[in-house]
Amino acid sequence: MLAVPDTPQAVGWYKRALGATELWNFGSVAGLEIAGAVFFLGEPANNGWESPLKLGMTSARVEVFCDDPDAFIAQAVQAGANGSTDKIKNHETPWGTHRQGGFIDPFGHIWLVGDRSPLRHFTS
């Protein structure tokens, strides 16, 4: 679950910026889906965890594999994500070239977005 300070605001951003589908929403907790991956958002509410914005750092990163990482990242940056930290580029790997880059969303979460080459290599 990604900690966010305002779940409705975060749901709106993820839908607009990343094309997320809202699966369910209880106000302070919601389930979303992006590119076939389900994830949850929630407001910490002083129950032992906190959002990266309040902590001043993040302890996790979200990784997404998709057909067009350039477009995915560009859409997020256009909607307000910080795309300056991990510019998209080709990486040489044991299975060939893997295109990947990243951004930090407005809620402080690090996202790495790459093409599907690792999935094709490890699941075929």
Write out the residue ranges for each language-model feature:
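Adenine-nucleotide cofactor-binding loop residues
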Residues: F107
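Vicinal oxygen chelate
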Residues: M1, V11-I104, V113-S124
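Short, surface-exposed ligand-recognition loops at beta-strand->loop->(often short) alpha-helix junctions
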Residues: L2-D6
